[in-house]
C-alpha cells in the first residue's frame, strides 16, 4: 500500500528544479488551434457542434440583457476545465483540477468581477436581490444576512465542488489500483479490472458533468447582476 493515499495529487515532476506539473493545465491549448488551419475531421465537427449548443444555452441563461461575447468566456471556461479533467484520468499526468489553487483561481475572479460590476452599475438591482419577493417585513433582516452569506460563499462552493469530485474519483481508482498487485486470485483480479474500467467510464462522465456545472453556475451568477 502507499504510505500516503493523497500523494498521487502531489506536484512532484521537476526538471532543473522547475515544476512541470502545472504545465499540463495548458496542454489543451496545443490541441485546439489545429482546427483553424487543418481540414476538420469528424471529432472536430462534433466538438464544434457541442460548443455551438453550449453557446446557445448560455445565451439563453444570460437573457436579453447579457453582453455580446459573454458566452465565449463561459464556453472557454467549460473547455479548459473539461480538458484538464480528462487529462487527469491518464496515467502520470498531473490532475490540476483536484487542487483548490486552480479551481479558486478560476472561481474567485469571476465572482468578484460579477459583484463589482453589479454593485457599481446596478446598485438598486443588487439590493433588491438581497430580499426575495414576498418576504414578510419581520424576516427581511434575516433574509439579507442569509442572502449575503450565500452570495459570499459562492466561489468557495464552486471551487470545492469541482475539487472534491475530482479527488473522490481518483482516490477510488488509486485504492483499486493498489489492491490489484496484492491479489493472487485471477477472479479477484478480473473483478478489480472490471470495476476499474467502470470507474474510469464514470469518471469520464463526471469530468464532463462537473465542467458543465461549473460553467452553467458561473453563467447564472453572471445573469443575476444584469
Swiss-Prot record:
Pfam family, one: ATP-synt_A
Keywords: ATP synthesis, CF(0), Hydrogen ion transport, Ion transport, Membrane, Mitochondrion, Mitochondrion inner membrane, Transmembrane, Transmembrane helix, Transport
Gene Ontology molecular-function annotations: proton-transporting ATP synthase activity, rotational mechanism
UniProt-annotated location(s): Mitochondrion inner membrane
SUPFAM superfamilies linked: F1F0 ATP synthase subunit A
Membrane topology note: Multi-pass membrane protein
Transmembrane segments: 18-38, 74-94, 100-120, 162-182, 187-207
Gene3D superfamilies: ATP synthase, F0 complex, subunit A (1.20.120.220)
GO CC annotations, alphabetized: mitochondrial inner membrane; proton-transporting ATP synthase complex
Domain of life from the UniProt record: Eukaryota
Function per UniProt: Mitochondrial membrane ATP synthase (F(1)F(0) ATP synthase or Complex V) produces ATP from ADP in the presence of a proton gradient across the membrane which is generated by electron transport complexes of the respiratory chain. F-type ATPases consist of two structural domains, F(1) - containing the extramembraneous catalytic core and F(0) - containing the membrane proton channel, linked together by a central stalk and a peripheral stalk. During catalysis, ATP synthesis in the catalytic domain of F(1) is coupled via a rotary mechanism of the central stalk subunits to proton translocation.
Family the UniProt entry places it in: Belongs to the ATPase A chain family.
Quaternary structure (record): F-type ATPases have 2 components, CF(1) - the catalytic core - and CF(0) - the membrane proton channel. CF(1) has five subunits: alpha(3), beta(3), gamma(1), delta(1), epsilon(1). CF(0) has three main subunits: a, b and c.
The protein, known as: ATP synthase subunit a
Amino acid at each position: 500500500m502507499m504510505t500516503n493515499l493523497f500523494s498521487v495529487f502531489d506536484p512532484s515532476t521537476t526538471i532543473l528544479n522547475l515544476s512541470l506539473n502545472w504545465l499540463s493545465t495548458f496542454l489543451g491549448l496545443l490541441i485546439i488551434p489545429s482546427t483553424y488551419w487543418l481540414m476538420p475531421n469528424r471529432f472536430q465537427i462534433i466538438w464544434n457542434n457541442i460548443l455551438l449548443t453550449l453557446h446557445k444555452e448560455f445565451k439563453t441563461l444570460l437573457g436579453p440583457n447579457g453582453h455580446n461575447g459573454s458566452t465565449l468566456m463561459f464556453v472557454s471556461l467549460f473547455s479548459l476545465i473539461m480538458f484538464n479533467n480528462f487529462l487527469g484520468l491518464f496515467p502520470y499526468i498531473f490532475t490540476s483540477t483536484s487542487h483548490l489553487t486552480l479551481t479558486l483561481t478560476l472561481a474567485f475572479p469571476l465572482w468578484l468581477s460579477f459583484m463589482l460590476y453589479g454593485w457599481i452599475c446596478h446598485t438598486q438591482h443588487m439590493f433588491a436581490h438581497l430580499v426575495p419577493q414576498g418576504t414578510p417585513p419581520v424576516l427581511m433582516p434575516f433574509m439579507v444576512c442569509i442572502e449575503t452569506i450565500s452570495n459570499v460563499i459562492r466561489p468557495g462552493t464552486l471551487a470545492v465542488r469541482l475539487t472534491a469530485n475530482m479527488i473522490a474519483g481518483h482516490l477510488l481508482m488509486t485504492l483499486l489500483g493498489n489492491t490489484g498487485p496484492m491479489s493472487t486470485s485471477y477472479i479477484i483480479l478480473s473483478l478489480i479490472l472490471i470495476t476499474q474500467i467502470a470507474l474510469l467510464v464514470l469518471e469520464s462522465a463526471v469530468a464532463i458533468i462537473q465542467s458543465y456545472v461549473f460553467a452553467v453556475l458561473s453563467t447564472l451568477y453572471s445573469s443575476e447582476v444584469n
